[in-house]
Amino acid sequence: MARGRRARSSIALSLALAFLAGGCAQFGSDAGATCPGPTLDPAVPPAASTAASVTYGFLIDRAYTGDAKRSPSYPCPQLPRTALDTVAGALPKLDLRPGDSVFAAWISHNSNDIREIFLPVAQVPRSTALDLPAAPARPKPPVNKLECNQYAEQVRSYNEQAKTWRATVGDLQQRARDADAKTVATFVDRQQAALRAAAPAQDPVGTDIYGGLAVAGGVFKSNPGRHKLVLFSDMSDTIGNAVRPDLAQSDVVIALYHRDDPNDQGVAQKQWETALRTLGARATVFLPWAATTVDKIADQLKEGGR
């Protein structure tokens, strides 16, 4: 009889161990061959953007001489106002982000005079760093199968905490994105108001293109990151300023580009492409008057990314 009891006890123990092993197996095997691991990892918050800030510069020609290089048919004083309206319309179409900057200056006979900067460098305010809650701690894997049931309960608890944590983090991040969008919109409104309030006076003395480029180069040097510059001009330099600014790795767009003589326009374009490349510009695009639109300027400034 004792032998029968021992046999029944052995069978019962075997069944219990088999049941325990089966219970563990149903949760998977993420924690190794012993017991299952968590089935839901908390989403890792996106790292702060590492994209460089962008500084956008706009140089607008307000000079008009009426000489052989710039004939009376040149559309000035329409050019400054057209340029101002174009820039104001393009700003909300750019991918502006906190940390990006904008400035604008006149091209005149004395372009490198600081008084020609009618829109001082302004930066989109940076947002404060997100204070995210700590992620829940992953349960410690069990040492053996005897701890499997307890571990399985810890896994279930962890998964619930991770789900809640992920939702909380997602909500905080969305609020931050919404706040940044409002900050950018407010910034754009202010810059647009300043652009539309600008009143360019016609300068009959001459045109100093290189002086304007020197202003832009100085601003770019003080603001690390990507640099994008738009000049609204026919690029007829009549002053011959000896300054040679550093436009290293800047993207340059020449807009509202027009000369009465098509041949002169083509020759000048090639000369300026070479000159700007010598100054370090990475790329130069020429947009004739008819092709200079709000959308085209925005597209060119977004070209090549941040």
Q: What positions do the PLM features span?
A:
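Bacterial signal peptide processing site
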Residues: 25-28
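Extracytoplasmic/secreted cell-surface and envelope-processing proteins
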Residues: 66-73, 112-116, 237-243, 262-267, ...
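C-terminal helix of von Willebrand factor
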Residues: 266-306
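C-terminal motif of bacterial Sec signal peptides marking the signal peptidase cleavage site
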Residues: 20-23
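Von Willebrand factor
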Residues: 51-224, 228-230
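VWA/integrin I-like adhesion module and closely mimicked acidic/polar interface patches used
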Residues: 235-275
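Bacterial N-terminal signal peptides that target proteins for export
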Residues: 1-13
